[in-house]
């Protein structure tokens, strides 16, 4: 046993220090990034935000809506091959460019992903997702996926430390998904005592990944557009959002009515709700590590997407970044004990 004394920070612990700017308007800011990925060699351009691969966020409907904003969607792994085929038959090439195919690490997951990718060559992204990316089996699966799909861009996670980030990149991942426990409906930290404050995880993993020519996506912990800006400021190449995109018409959650008001269910993918739906319940050897919440219906996701992108553009103007690419170079974080004036938050 040992104790690390270095302070680790989350998004709530910092603000971005403003700096002089020559920008005249938020409209001057370019949010589109262009990436060429280390292993696949593929080039992609777009706004590097990803809707999370949760079945109450990462739906086909979400992909259709967010593609209009140049945003990616990691479509959840619980769609059948037949459902994928029906979606691909109606989706435009531009929508497919903004889609990630999500998978687990079982043999059945692998075979299903092989079939899905064979449906259309425009499916260029694979998101390999497990709660704990530190297992040797996971590393081996990433290597297997790279061998099977040499020209596909592979995103793999989740991890929170530099050495494991490097391991996954060396095994074939183009993008490493960073985050253990920060999600709005994740209870891993309280159930297991395991985790890592998200901003520090992003900073440390970005440093490790970029040294090898890889990239990272910050997954979890964002509650408002300012957190998205902080994640990019900390060095994230992509930012994945779950709770911020939940509760919308495109989100796919079940709708319930209470006292005449409608709510949408949103749950973590290791929650009892998710396991009851997809694997027949919580196995005897494990505990649920997620919760289920009821969100007031929030309408079309487009309104939220505009709010997120508007906040991100504004953050760039405050530090003089004319392009999103410049934000991390121009970011200085200051430690704080308050984020906002909350006097009217209860009204």
Swiss-Prot record:
K(+) binds at residues 181, 183. Keywords: Metal-binding, NADP, Oxidoreductase, Potassium. It catalyses: IMP + NH4(+) + NADP(+) = GMP + NADPH + 2 H(+). It comes from the Bacteria. NADP(+) binds at residues 108-131, 216-239. The active site is at residue 186. GO terms for biological process: purine nucleotide metabolic process. GO terms for cellular component: cytosol; GMP reductase complex. The keyword Methyltransferase does not apply. InterPro entries: Aldolase_TIM (IPR013785), GMP_reductase (IPR050139), GMPR (IPR005993), IMP_DH/GMP_Rdtase_CS (IPR015875), IMP_DH_GMPRt (IPR001093). One of its GO terms (molecular function) is GMP reductase activity. Its EC number is 1.7.1.7. Catalyzes the irreversible NADPH-dependent deamination of GMP to IMP. It functions in the conversion of nucleobase, nucleoside and nucleotide derivatives of G to A nucleotides, and in maintaining the intracellular balance of A and G nucleotides. Homotetramer. Belongs to the IMPDH/GMPR family. GuaC type 1 subfamily. This is GMP reductase. It comes from Salmonella typhi. The gene is guaC.
């Amino acid at each position: 046993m040992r104790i690390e004394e270095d302070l680790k920070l989350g998004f709530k612990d910092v603000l971005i220090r403003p700096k002089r700017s020559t920008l005249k308007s938020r409209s001057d800011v370019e949010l589109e990034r262009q990436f060429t990925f280390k292993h696949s060699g593929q080039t992609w351009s777009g706004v590097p935000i990803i809707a999370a691969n949760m079945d109450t966020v990462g739906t086909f409907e979400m992909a259709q809506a967010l593609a209009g904003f140049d945003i990616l969607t990691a479509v959840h792994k619980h769609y059948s091959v037949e459902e994928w085929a029906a979606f691909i038959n109606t989706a435009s090439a531009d929508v497919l460019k903004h889609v990630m195919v999500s998978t687990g690490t079982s043999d059945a997951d692998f075979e299903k992903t092989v079939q899905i990718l064979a449906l259309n060559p425009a499916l260029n992204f694979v998101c390999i997702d497990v709660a704990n990316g530190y297992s040797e089996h996971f590393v081996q699966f990433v290597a297997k996926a790279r061998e099977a799909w040499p020209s596909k861009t592979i995103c793999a996670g989740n991890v929170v430390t530099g050495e494991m980030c490097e391991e996954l990149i060396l095994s074939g991942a183009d993008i490493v998904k960073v985050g253990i426990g920060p999600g709005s409906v994740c209870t891993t930290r309280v159930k297991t005592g395991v985790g890592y404050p998200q901003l520090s995880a992003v900073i440390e993993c970005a440093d490790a990944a970029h040294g090898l020519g890889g990239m990272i996506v910050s997954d979890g912990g964002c509650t408002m557009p300012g957190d998205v800006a902080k994640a990019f400021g900390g060095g994230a190449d992509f930012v994945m959002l779950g709770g911020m995109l939940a509760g919308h018409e495109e989100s796919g959650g079940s709708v319930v009515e209470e006292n005449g008001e409608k709510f949408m269910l949103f749950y973590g993918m290791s929650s009892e709700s998710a396991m009851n739906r997809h694997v027949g319940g919580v196995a005897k050897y494990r505990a649920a590590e997620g919760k289920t919440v009821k969100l007031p219906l929030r309408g079309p996701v487009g309104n939220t997407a505009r709010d997120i992108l508007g906040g991100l553009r504004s953050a760039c103007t405050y530090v003089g970044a004319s392009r999103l690419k410049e934000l991390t170079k121009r970011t200085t974080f200051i430690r704080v004990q308050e984020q906002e004036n909350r006097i009217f938050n209860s009204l």
